[in-house]
Structures are given as C-alpha cells and as structure tokens.
Amino acid sequence: MTENLQDMFESSYRGEAPEQLAARPPWSIGQPQPEILKLIEQGKVHGDVLDAGCGEAATALYLAERGHTAVGLDAAPTAIQLAKGYAAERGLTNVTFDVADISNFTGYDGRFGTIIDSTLFHSMPVELREGYQQSIVRAAAPGANYIVLVFDKAAFPPDIDGPHPVSEPELREIVSKYWTVDDISPARLYANGDGFQDGGAQRFAEFREESNGWVSMAGWLLQAHRD
C-alpha cells in the first residue's frame, strides 16, 4: 500500500479527513455490508476467515461473535487499534488484528477457508491488484472461498479522484487468473449518509438515499473458490 494512501485512510479513521463530514468514515456502518451479511447467513463462510482490508472490522467481529476464528488485516494503524478495542469490549479471543500491506503480506500460508474483501478491492491502486491476489492466494487453504464487494465503474463519473471501481469483465479478468469464479452479480454498497457533502453524491449514477439514513451505490458481488 502506498504511503499517501495509508495516510488518507489514517486521517479518515481519526476523523480528520477534510472531505469527511462525520467522525467516522462513511463506510463504517457498524455491521457487515448487507450483501456480505446475506452470504454469511447462507452459510458461504467456512474455516478460518480473513477480513482483508478490515477497517474497523465489522465483518470479522460479527463472524467471531458467531464462533468463527477470524483475522483482520489493514494498512491503517488507527483502524486496527479501533478493531482491537471493539474485540476487547466484546470479550472476543477468537479474532486477531494486525497492520499489514494487503498487497504484500506473509505469515498465513494456506490458512484461510474464506477470504472476504468488503470494499477493499476498489480502495487500492490498480497496480497493486496483482500483488494483492498473489498474497491472498498464498494465504488461502485448498477449497477456499473468496468473496468481493466492489464499486461498479459505471456508477462513477470518469473524472473521479478516489476509488478505483471496476466493470464486470474487468473484475472477472483479474480474479479468474487466480480463482475459479462462480458468480458475479449486481450489488449495493452502503454508507452513512451524513458522511457525504451536500450535492456531491448527485454526480454518481444509481445513488440512493435509504430509509435508515444510509445511502447506497451500485457495485458487484463476486463469489469464487480455489480448487
């Protein structure tokens, strides 16, 4: 992960990002993303779980509370500090967290039965994707599942400065080099509505204001596995 990108996420988790209107980053919604939650409830998670680019680790914490052994990795030390604090508050001993470059990490070879990427994929520079895929494949156990929730490129204006969303063919091409892709389907990604500046969200296609104060945008939900 580049130093500038790490600094950007650090300022977000500290509540210091100039474009951030709320104390927490808009993507920190206090629970797993609903699309990920559906797959968890459908029994798509097995074995030890890697929450890749975990942030404040809502997914890893949720799974640990339900008996899974989970690991959360993120490049932002403040996010990891927050995640460790939440785990301690809940008395969870089956989840661990560490600061790591998700595009080049070691120490977990062949461990994880499920790897979950909840909005990480579009958060890293394009040039880091290959290293990221190689790192998580190295960490995957035989038969591992890989789940990705990522922004759809069609929902973003072409001059956007920030995330790196993907088209369905682009996502399939990248992931299929390393995994057997089982499904890619349209999805929604949710965020706290108070984290957006007035009028700024109207530049995005398929932007929705939800009844619970969240907002949502179009994305892709990928499911894949290792043979």
From Swiss-Prot:
The entry's cellular-component GO terms read: cytoplasm
Family, according to the entry, reads as follows: Belongs to the methyltransferase superfamily.
Q: What does this protein do?
A: Involved in cellular response to chemical stress and may contribute to resistance toward antimicrobial natural compounds as well as drugs. Catalyzes the methylation and detoxification of the P.aeruginosa toxin 2-heptyl-1-hydroxy-4(1H)-quinolinone (HQNO) to 2-heptyl-1-methoxy-4(1H)-quinolinone (HMOQ). Can also methylate 3-bromo-2-heptyl-1-hydroxy-4(1H)-quinolinone, and shows much lower activity with 1-hydroxyquinolin-4(1H)-one, quercetin, 4-hydroxyquinolin-2(1H)-one (DHQ) and 4-hydroxyisoquinolin-1(2H)-one.
Q: Which CDD domains match?
A: AdoMet_MTases (cd02440)
Q: What is this protein called?
A: 2-heptyl-1-hydroxyquinolin-4(1H)-one methyltransferase
Q: Which domain of life is it from?
A: Bacteria
Identify the gene encoding this protein: htm
Location(s) in or outside the cell: Cytoplasm
Q: Could you tell me which species this protein originates from?
A: Mycobacteroides abscessus (strain ATCC 19977 / DSM 44196 / CCUG 20993 / CIP 104536 / JCM 13569 / NCTC 13031 / TMC 1543 / L948)
Q: How does it assemble?
A: Monomer.
Q: Which residues form a coiled coil?
A: none
The keyword Cytoplasm is assigned to this record: yes
Q: Per its UniProt record, what InterPro entries does this chain match?
A: Methyltranfer_dom, SAM-dependent_MTases_sf
UniProt key word Cell division = no
Q: Provide a Gene Ontology MF annotation, just one.
A: methyltransferase activity
UniProt-listed GO biological process terms: methylation
Which keywords appear in this protein's UniProt record, sorted alphabetically? Cytoplasm, Methyltransferase, S-adenosyl-L-methionine, Transferase
Q: Entry's Pfam families?
A: Methyltransf_31
Checking PANTHER family in the record gives: CYSTEINE SULFINATE DESULFINASE_CYSTEINE DESULFURASE AND RELATED ENZYMES, PTHR32183
Q: What is its EC number?
A: 2.1.1.374
The reaction(s) catalysed by this protein are: 2-heptyl-1-hydroxy-4(1H)-quinolinone + S-adenosyl-L-methionine = 2-heptyl-1-methoxy-4(1H)-quinolinone + S-adenosyl-L-homocysteine + H(+); 3-bromo-2-heptyl-1-hydroxy-4(1H)-quinolinone + S-adenosyl-L-methionine = 3-bromo-2-heptyl-1-methoxy-4(1H)-quinolinone + S-adenosyl-L-homocysteine + H(+)
